[in-house]
Amino acid sequence: MSQRQVAYVFDLNKCIGCHTCTMACKQLWTNRDGREYMYWNNVETRPGKGYPKNWEGKGGGFDQEGKLKTNGIIPIMADYGGRIGDFNLNEVLLEGKADQVVPHEKATWGPNWDEDEGKGEFPNNHSFYLPRICNHCSNPACLAACPTKAIYKRPEDGIVVVDQTRCRGYRYCVKACPYGKMYFNLQKGKSEKCIGCYPRVEKGEAPACVKQCSGRIRFWGYRDDKNGPIYKLVEQWKVALPLHAEYGTEPNVFYVPPMNTTPPPFEEDGRLGDKPRIPIEDLEALFGPGVKQALATLGGEMAKRRKAQASELTDILIGFTNKDRYGV
């Protein structure tokens, strides 16, 4: 068990889908050595199939009795987009068998394949962005599934890491993670994942995806720091919710659900209806039954600000400075 736990809060009302977080992570950690297909950080358009494709249906996690599920599957490479970066260079440059450099395989999926598609028909369509990283769970299924004890939680901060010297490449962890955030390096024969940028954390720096976020949607810190934004958003105000808590892994990435600030959908007669554009049931399927109360709290605090009244919650969510948004 870790002595303390770092956690994240992502405010989905501020995410603009710019993928700066993804590129920061990609350039730092996964642009070489068999990691080309890996996106430890990715930003999905929801509703959508996500990355890897249909990850919500891959199984894994724990059952209601707390037992590790054994029904998880290992996504095939096509679910990630195929052999990314694998081109016919030999045929074109050395053998003269082709005139144009193209991938060996035609991609049928990728990390942004269904970007901005969402759900519904214009003008009643809707979508929002969902950034995803490893949840650094308090009860990680990947750890429970590993027979070589290669996966552990760092005692000082709860970050989940893989000991590469102990990993034997059995991929039970890939099957067990219900979020599809454990990857297998085919070149090295080892499992790899987001490491929470712990080399940066040890130097007092925030993770790269947090530090580079253009929309300032990311909050980061210790869960038990009562003066920090994580504790206040998760425990005090209860507006930040875990993704698929029913998986039983106790994730430490939380989300402020998107508010329905856009006009409601049109009725058949052309008038604006009274239903929210993003169906509440869609949000509850992701973030659980606390969505309605979280949205009600957010709406109430925003109403106070429109009346020129003070609101601690909106001040926290604005995150005026880096110090306001993160720190350990």
From Swiss-Prot:
One of its GO terms (cellular component) is membrane. Residues 6-35, 125-156, 158-187 form the 4Fe-4S ferredoxin-type domain. [3Fe-4S] cluster binds at C146, C167, C173. GO terms for molecular function: 3 iron, 4 sulfur cluster binding; 4 iron, 4 sulfur cluster binding; electron transfer activity; metal ion binding. InterPro entries: 4Fe4S_Fe-S-bd, DMSO_Rdtase_II_Fe-S_su. [4Fe-4S] cluster 2 binds at C25, C194, C197, C209. Keywords: 3Fe-4S, 4Fe-4S, Electron transport, Iron, Iron-sulfur, Metal-binding, Periplasm, Repeat, Transport. Binds 1 [3Fe-4S] cluster. Binds 3 [4Fe-4S] clusters. Heterotrimer of alpha, beta and gamma subunits. Electron transfer subunit of the terminal reductase during anaerobic growth on chlorate. This is Chlorate reductase subunit beta. It comes from Ideonella dechloratans.
